[in-house]
Amino acid sequence: MTVSRIISLAPSATATLAAAGLAERVVGVTAHCELDRPTVGGWLNPDYEGLAELSPELVCTSDSLQGEIHEELKARGYNTFHHEPSRLTDVLEGFESLPKAAGAAAAGRELRESAERRLTAVDERVEARLAEGASRPTVYCEEWSDPPMAAGNWVPDAVEAAGGRYPFVTPGERSQEVDREIIEGVDPDHAVLHICGTGSQVSVDRIHNREWAVEPAVHVFDDSLLNQPSPHLIRGIEQLSRRLYPE
């Protein structure tokens, strides 16, 4: 069944729908989403009355933090799509399953296949550089700074896909606090700041001003490029790989 009225309560779902060519079906979003649509509250505090006024045929949520919201939506009788990715493979699966839930299975397959082709291209470039004698660098990704948190979930997979090593968090596990001893013990070659909710408005001094006896190359990424389980993540992997293996 084709769904023509979708409300997205997750920025990742909004970005995925847009990338699949379904933006015109989205009639409502949160204040954190990219599409210019009527807003129905925030990520963790939806406006249920405003949502009802838009008469959605499908409401999208994401992450365990929206689990209770998802259950409330079901209790109110809404048709829902809920996705809780923890690995890169889960993110790719969502590229296909979300459009399918909206009645656009072909668009979902193409979106996933396109992402997989892009990841293959990254892998081939990395393998070529390694064959030329390049070393696989160690990367530290920080999604929060107070206290410093090493990014988890799909980020370890993303770093590996970009050609890096990521010994801070096991793939699929939640982000973990790190301290000076941990960072100095690893001595990363690169540090990536992708602080939640800041976009790219972060200074490299967040690393330089700490009394860590390490000297990584520091990069600032828009937080959506690594934190958001959407097609933005694929672009983040491509950009990270180019930083790790510059021409």
Report the location of each language-model feature.
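N-terminal ligand-binding lobe of clamshell/alpha-beta domains
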Residues: 1-247
